[in-house]
Amino acid sequence: DGVFKDVDVVLFSHVGSNLQTGWGASQGSGLVSVLYSFEGQAAHAAGAPWRGRSALDAVELMDVGWNFRREHLRLQTRSHYVIRNGGDQPNVVPPTASVWYYFRELDYKKIRELWAIGDSVAEGAAMMTGTKLASERVLGSAWPGHFNKPIAEDMTENITLVRLPKWKTDDQR
């Protein structure tokens, strides 16, 4: 995609629990972080619910659809989500709602495929509820890396020079 065109080096460290540096192919997964936002139509939930189109229903159906689809994904696949916006009060059909997903896989191509499945599930949820998938916003990503040995060795040298802090028991909680 050209995101690193003309870039000579990227200094990156994902600090593990052992606070050490390493090199070579990373053993972890990469991810894309996506916020799906739906728009519907507000209505009084008791007085005229037929006038409403619940964006929250779209979010919930996306989550249900994703959980059924997840059963048929690779064992290495991981995903997580939280509902960020589910409406303001129970007696109003929510006109807006959003859900935040992490799609995790072992390589860039598989992450993109997983993300495309998420998009399809979101579009299906909007169709089922008569709402609109208003936006799909990438909040961040972390592609699987291949870490550079000379940079890792320099980082280790700097850690040795600066020294790590002495952790107290309370710091570990």
Task: Describe each model-derived feature in a short phrase.
Residues D1-P94, R104:
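Histidine/acidic-residue-rich, glycine-tolerant segments that coordinate divalent metal ions
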Residues D57-R173:
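Metal-dependent amide/peptide-bond hydrolase catalytic core
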